[in-house]
Structure formats: C-alpha cells, structure tokens
Amino acid sequence: TRVPQGGRIRLTIEDKDVDFRVSCLPLMGEEKVVMRVLDTTKGVLTLEQLGFAASSMDLVKKNIDKTVGIILVTGPTGSGKSTTLYSIMHMLNNEGVNIVTLEDPVEYFIHGINQSQIRPDIGFTFAAGLRSLLRQDPDIMMVGEIRDNETAELAIHAALTGHLVMSTLHTNDAIGAIPRLIDMKIEPFLLSSVMDLIVAQRLARRLCQYCKREKAMPEEVVTDVKAKLSKIKPEILARYLPDYGQKPMMFYEPVGCDRCNKTGYKGRVALIEALDVNDFIRESILKDN
C-alpha cells in the first residue's frame, strides 16, 4: 500500500473471540504494521485489578455517586484510558440506569449498556453523536475522547443539564486537563462548576513475579527520590510509606525465566494519579491560575 491504513479484525482463536486493531504505515521499500490485541473474553477488570490504590478508588466511588458532573481520564495513546472507563461504567451498570456511550471503536461489549460507534466518514462524529445522546434520556454518558471545542462544549452542557459525563483527553498529567480545556475555549466558570475528577495514567511493564531480583538503588537515584519525597507532608508520607527511612531503599530488576519468555516482564500495571477537583482547585480555575 502507498498510504497509511487502519482497521479492525475479529477472529475466534481456541474458542476465544479476539479483536485486532491494525495500523499500517508505508516505509521506504517495506511496510510497518502494529497490532493491538484485545481478548474480549476476559471481561471488564475492576479498578483494583487495574492497579488503583485504595485512596484512588475511594475518589472514583465518591464522584460517581454524585450522578452529575464530569470525570476525565487522561494519558497518551495506549495508556489504558478506555479500559479504566469501562471499569467505571461496569460499577455504574445497574438496572434502571441508562448508560449511553460514543466510542471509536467499541472495544468491549457490556450487557446493559447502550454502546454506539462513531463514523466520522459519514458525519457521525463525537459532536454529532453527543447532540443525539442528549435526546436519548441518558443518566450517564461516556464519550470516547474530547477532540475539539464543539465536543468539549457539548460535554460541559450535558453535565450542566444533570448528567454524569465521562471522557478522555491527551494530557501529560491530571492537572494538565484544565488548561487543555481552557485552550479549547471552555469558559473557566463553566469548567469549575462541572469538573469533579481527573485521572491521569500510564502503563508500565510488570516485572515477572517468578524471577525478579532485589537490588539496592544506585546512590544518585536514592538522592533524587529523597529530594522528591521531602516535598511531601510528613503525615502523608507516613500513611503511604510507613517504613520510609528505616531500611535501605531497594528495588527489583528483571532477570528472565521460562514463565516470561526470558524477558523479565509479564503483563502491565497502571500508574495512577487521581485529582479530586476540590474548592481550592475550583477557585484557581475561576482565577485562571
């Protein structure tokens, strides 16, 4: 092929329905293909299984109980944002609750949730879909991604009219979602009134639990870690790192064994930053600070 292509393939392999998202890029004399493999039979994981700490899960539960407002999940492409939203929707998926989604594409089918896949090629964009969703009497709306000003404005409007809206953004950290939306021409006073929770995440390779090896941290890393931890209030540090300062800092390094195909890694783990938009942050947004 002479142009980039993308698509989706669904196969049944050993009685498992497996989805492949394929991206092809033409190079000089060859073609580069990247495939993302989605095992649809695994079902939706819980937040705990995804790697959320108890404190982060508490923030999510507190904010989804409000039934109105906006919850955003941010991070780069392939960081597991959609997987986190599926987990949250699964928590909210109860009889009598009308959950409607706009996705690109629908990655997992969840019984009881009304899932719709956008088609930009025929004009069915996130913005066009959101307008229709508002007439579908939804309780909860999930928009796969806020990509432009129009989608952002419609999501804000939906939250202001009594809906819980969940979506994703591409930002480097949680707090970065706020200036990103302001850059999309969202008025700060509107943003401060509807934004409730922002979750930023990354995916890291998980060390193989069978062959990982403990190793002392290099001195320069210890110095850097101590400098960063010194900025944290002592009571918070004691809560999350009760043994800090009582023994040498250690970490684990990959080794490789038959269970991990000699790579030293098996699976991935989510690194989560959950930002509860409290009154202080709301006031800062209003001051555009």
Residue ranges of each PLM-predicted region?
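Short, flexible helix-loop junctions that flank or precede catalytic/ligand sites
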Residues: 1-289
